[in-house]
């Protein structure tokens, strides 16, 4: 079991939470993490790049010079690929799929590894259950960050569905990223300096890995 410090919504220490060790690994697997982040980055590529081939470049319909008796190499168009302003041979077209396959077990191993790194570095905190604000308030979330000594830190706040007011309250905080527990990726975890996870999210993660 791992012990996580839970904070109240005002940013002060509330209690300790024992989290199942199934969420962590003994030794973080760097290759699994690398593969997961690489696949996530690749999946965001839209593949809208498009170059023009010889037949698509404007102009070049007239033969530059006659075929014979000029002393120059024969050519049929000024848009041939070896000419300046010519088409591109085998250039990228917008039908390429950049998605990379990562097995589910590898993705889970990568996620556990990222959680383990944050835990070992002391960069993982919790948020007590039922901590959503009554109304959206950026000021209260600023107080939370200040009281928790998280100023000038890139904070990842992992919440559950019924924490909508906290989500709205952090929209204007530049260094705070708020995501639902099932939207968090390995890249999100590694990009953040500190990860604050809602108590309900720990329960959901534990239920997920136990399947």
Curated annotation (Swiss-Prot):
Q: What is this protein called?
A: Large ribosomal subunit protein uL4
Which Gene3D superfamilies did the record assign? 3.40.1370.10
Q: Which InterPro entries match?
A: Ribosomal_uL4, Ribosomal_uL4-like, Ribosomal_uL4_dom_sf
Q: What processes in GO biological process is this protein linked to?
A: translation
Q: Which domain of life is it from?
A: Bacteria
Q: Which family does it belong to?
A: Belongs to the universal ribosomal protein uL4 family.
Assembly and partners are described as: Part of the 50S ribosomal subunit.
Residue ranges annotated as compositionally biased, kind Basic residues, are 60-72
Its keywords, alphabetically, are: Ribonucleoprotein, Ribosomal protein, RNA-binding, rRNA-binding
- Ranges for the region named Disordered are 44-90
């Amino acid at each position: 079991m791992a012990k996580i410090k839970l904070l109240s919504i005002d940013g002060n220490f509330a209690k300790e939470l024992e989290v199942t060790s199934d969420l962590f690994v003994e030794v973080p697997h760097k290759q699994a993490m690398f593969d997961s982040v690489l696949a996530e980055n690749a999946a965001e590529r839209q593949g809208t790049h498009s170059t023009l081939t010889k037949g698509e470049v404007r102009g070049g319909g007239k033969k530059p010079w006659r075929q014979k008796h000029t002393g120059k190499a024969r050519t049929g168009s000024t848009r041939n690929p070896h000419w300046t302003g010519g088409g591109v041979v085998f250039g990228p077209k917008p039908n390429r799929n950049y998605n990379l396959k990562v097995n589910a077990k590898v993705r889970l191993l990568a996620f556990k590894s990222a959680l383990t790194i944050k835990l070992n570095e002391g960069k993982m905190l919790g948020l007590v259950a039922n901590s959503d604000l009554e109304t959206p308030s950026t000021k209260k979330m600023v107080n939370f960050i200040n009281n928790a000594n998280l100023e000038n830190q890139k904070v990842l706040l992992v919440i559950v569905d019924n924490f909508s007011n906290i989500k709205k309250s952090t929209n204007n905080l530049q260094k705070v990223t708020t995501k639902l527990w099932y939207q968090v990726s390995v890249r999100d975890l590694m990009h953040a300096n500190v990860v604050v996870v809602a108590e309900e999210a720990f329960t959901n993660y534990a239920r997920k890995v136990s399947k």
